[in-house]
From Swiss-Prot:
Record keyword Secreted present: yes
Pfam families tied to this protein: lci (PF12197)
Name the UniProt record assigns to this protein: Antimicrobial peptide LCI
GO cellular component assignments: extracellular region
GO biological process: defense response to bacterium
Function: Has antibacterial activity against X.oryzae pv oryzae and R.solanacearum, but not E.coli or P.carotovorum subsp carotovorum. May bind DNA or mRNA.
Misc remark: Heat stable. Resistant to proteolysis by tryspin and pepsin, but susceptible to pronase E and proteinase K.
Record's subcellular location: Secreted
Keyword Ligase: no
Top-level division of the source organism's lineage: Bacteria
Entry keyword set: Antibiotic, Antimicrobial, Secreted
Length: 47
């Protein structure tokens, strides 16, 4: 699973927990048309 998180300054947490699911930061890109950064998170797998 993938989650996209918006940030105006490009600063993203290395990970966060939402509803008991841990998400790990993978990469980010700048959306020039909207004027903010988008961080890409993936679900952390306990395996």
């Amino acid at each position: 699973a993938i989650k996209l998180v918006q940030s105006p300054n490009g600063n993203f947490a290395a990970s966060f927990v939402l509803d008991g699911t841990k998400w790990i930061f993978k990469s980010k890109y700048y959306d020039s048309s909207k004027g903010y950064w988008v961080g890409i998170y993936e679900v952390w797998d306990r395996k």
